[in-house]
Amino acid sequence: MSMKRFLFLTNYPSPYRVRFFDELGKDSDVTVLFYDPLEAITHRNAAWFENSNGGFRGIQLKQTLAVREESLCLDVVKYLKKDYDAIVISGYSSPTAVLAMLYLRLRRIPFYMEVDGGLIRQERKIKYWLKKRLVTLAPRWLGTGKFTTDYLVHYGAKRENVETYHFSSLCREDILAEIVPMGEKQALRKALGIGEEKKVLAIGQFIPRKGFDVLLHAAKGLEKNVGTYIVGGEATPEYLRLRQELGLTNVHFLGFQKKDALAKYYKASVLFVLPTREDIWGLVINEAMAYGLGVITTDRCVAGLELVEDGVNGYIVPVEDVSALETAMAKALAGDTQAMGAASLEKIRPYTIETMAQDHGQLLGR
């Protein structure tokens, strides 16, 4: 039996997508078109990218012009003329994706629109109408769970034509077999030079959307034996100033960490916090749970809404609510963080690159 042939159109080769395409390519013939040139991805450290194992055919499209910093690649059309068992367009807002969908509609070639996540917002009617027009260009959709399905349906997708998959950046081997014992956590904290008895971890860029200003205000009310460590590149002057104004001697900013070093910070922690103002998914939630950590995040984080069960493996708090975040952190730290971590591990086990590839293979190969 011949392999199924799949074509994907996406922005750039992020590490988890490279791993996913490699895994999917073990049982199918996968071609991936990238429309954003790597030199334009300035918000990512060069060490963040990974090379493919050769499991798929990657093609960098040629940028014809940039539309509001988005790439328009007219050469995408020539690749859409070839025969595939399934075509998947990731997202719907880039000029290249819109061009591809319009061409496929015109030629009556079936395809899927894939959306990693989405949050329904209050917005002007014209913006809602435009999004609806774009979403409904597709005849079928792929999403990451209930909340993404609700998002797509809000913009006109037919619920019965939305399929879901386990979204992840992790391979099966990346998920711990069991939670890290407290004795090992203490030894790691000592080795890392962490003086506080309890360590809270946050990871993300120092940008307003991540909500680290909210975390700093919440950390002010925590006990002094709790250290909050934020990993995400160089802290901006605004965050340095806020830390000083609040007198937060137990809040620490760490630069970019490679995978092995970051693993030690995860394992040394007892709680993970993502106080985001908005994340259409938030893969860092998957990663924290894979290290056996309870998670606190906001009601504007789709990964949290899908994966965190309030009071079981973490808490969901209202966005930008300092008091609620402080209360949730204090409650989690005073409780059984190991039990929360164990619940996170069990919840996250199906969310792997291998399962994600298996889901796609089954859905696209019908």
Model-assigned labels for residue ranges:
Residues G294-T298:
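Short hydrophobic beta-strand element within catalytic cores of glycosyltransferases
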Residues Y239-Q257:
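Nucleotide-activated donor-binding/catalytic signature segment of Leloir-type glycosyltransferases, i.e.
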Residues F256-Q257, K264-S269:
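Short alpha-helical donor nucleotide-sugar binding micro-motif in glycosyltransferases
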Residues R19, K198-G221, E238:
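A conserved mid-protein helix/loop that constitutes part of the nucleotide-sugar donor-binding site
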Residues E309-G311, Y315-V322, A330-D336:
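Conserved acidic donor-binding segment of nucleotide-sugar-dependent glycosyltransferases
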Residues T136-Q186, I194:
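Donor nucleotide-sugar binding/catalytic pocket of nucleotide-sugar-dependent glycosyltransferases
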Residues P95, I109-K127, L137-R140, T144, ...:
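A short, histidine- and acid-enriched strand-loop-helix "catalytic/donor-clamping" loop
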Residues R277:
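Aromatic "clamp/platform" in nucleotide-sugar-dependent glycosyltransferases that forms part
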